[in-house]
A protein has these predicted regions:
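Short alpha-helix
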Residues: 287-310
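A short SAM/SAH-binding and catalytic strip from SAM-dependent methyltransferases
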Residues: 202-217
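Conserved class I S-adenosyl-L-methionine
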Residues: 55-72, 76-131, 145, 149, 233-273, ...
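A short glycine-rich, Lys/Arg-flanked "PGG" loop and its adjoining helix->strand segment in the class I
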Residues: 217-232
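A short acidic, Gly/Pro-enriched loop at the edge of an enzyme's catalytic core
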Residues: 193-204
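Acceptor-substrate binding/catalytic loop of class I
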Residues: 237, 241-250, 280-294
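Class I SAM-dependent methyltransferase SAM/SAH-binding core
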Residues: 135-139, 143-192
Length: 347
């Protein structure tokens, strides 16, 4: 996908608890939970507080870092400009998910994960308030899970993604060929896609993908052009304040019987390679771009997309029953998993 980033860390596992086989598959691809460590080809599930100390004392990944220039300043993404003009993703594996498309399609399936079905897709469609017969642009659509859900409501959907394998999956999974349309194209150059004309879309969405795309501005500018005046955009991403790959983790405070969310770095923008199969000497990687919240707000505004509504979504997954349930559930309810931004096309 161009590229969906999925963090299943909100289950708030108690230290040392072993997730299910399916959940481990998510963690191997999206290491947002620091309870998985590797030694050679062996995976060890260890208490989060121990893994946090190990993480602080061990160089676990290579990251290109830059501090934002000015508070609330330009894009917070200028450190990533080495990828342009725009460093076409088709020539740089890791900046789209075509090379892991088959695996991802099998993982997500026809209707998406539990988070997609119960939280994300209902939330996106509610925030867009899109009606039957209206036209939705699904930016970085992957294998079309949002498009299928929208089409079931009678919405015309056009999905765009650079990963050819995922576009093929979206076409094969279509439920309504008259309402669902999918195209392989770079979302940073939407004008180059012949199916996207200026001012024809009532709404647009970018779901669990924007943190894997750089730079931001061409994406927003293309969406602005494609939307009708007053058209809405909803962007959903792992919450950039609390869900930072390899820079955030849960820690259990034994003395006070509390679970804390630790954040080691936030304002620094980072390009973070993610190994899809940790523990192996070789294997595919994807790339995540952490940015502070100001980067999203400022670039959207600069493109003429004005944020009018924001929601912070918590995980719907309950922690395990036990003596720590109340504390773990409080952290689940207080620390959001996803950030949803709605912006309106000005003019």
């Amino acid at each position: 996908m161009q590229a969906v980033q999925f963090f299943d860390c909100a289950h708030n596992y108690s230290p040392g608890e072993r997730p299910s086989k399916q959940q481990r598959a998510f963690y191997l691809a999206f290491p947002a939970v620091e309870s998985l460590m590797q030694c050679g080809s062996t995976n060890f599930w260890i208490p989060a507080n121990i893994s946090n100390r190990m993480r602080k004392n061990t160089k676990r990944f290579e990251a290109h870092r830059t501090h934002p220039s000015t508070p609330g300043g330009a894009e917070g993404e200028k450190s990533f400009r080495t990828q342009t003009k725009h460093a076409r993703q088709s020539h740089e594996p890791g900046l789209h998910w075509g090379h892991v498309g088959s695996w991802y399609d099998d993982l997500i399936g026809q209707d998406g994960s539990d988070h997609h079905q119960k939280l994300i897709i209902p939330g996106v469609l509610r925030m867009l308030d899109i009606k039957p017969g209206e036209h939705l642009l699904d930016v970085a659509c992957g294998q079309g899970v949002l498009g299928r859900a929208a089409a079931r409501r009678g919405v015309q959907t056009t999905g765009v993604d650079l990963a050819g394998s995922l576009i093929q999956a979206a076409l094969e999974r279509r439920e309504n060929t008259s309402l669902e349309h999918y195209y392989q194209a770079d979302v940073r150059d939407l004008a180059a896609c012949g199916a996207i004309a200026p001012g024809i879309f009532d709404a647009a969405a970018c779901v669990l993908a924007i943190a894997n795309i750089t730079p931001l501005s061409p994406v927003w500018q293309g969406i602005y052009t494609a939307l009708k005046p007053g058209g809405k955009l909803v962007v959903v991403l792992p919450h950039p304040c609390f869900r930072i790959p390899k820079q955030s983790s849960w820690q259990w405070d034994q003395q006070n019987a509390m679970q804390h969310r630790l954040v080691d770095a936030y304002l620094t923008s980072e390009k973070i390679p993610i190994a899809m199969h940790p523990g192996r000497d070789t294997g595919p990687t994807t790339t995540t771009f952490h940015r502070p919240l100001q980067a999203y707000i400022n670039t959207l505004g600069s493109a003429g997309l004005w944020i009018d509504h924001t929601e912070e979504w918590i995980s719907g997954k309950m922690p395990p029953q036990g003596i720590r349930f109340a504390a773990l559930d409080k952290s689940r309810r207080e620390i959001p998993l996803f950030l949803a931004l709605r912006a309106i096309k000005a003019g």
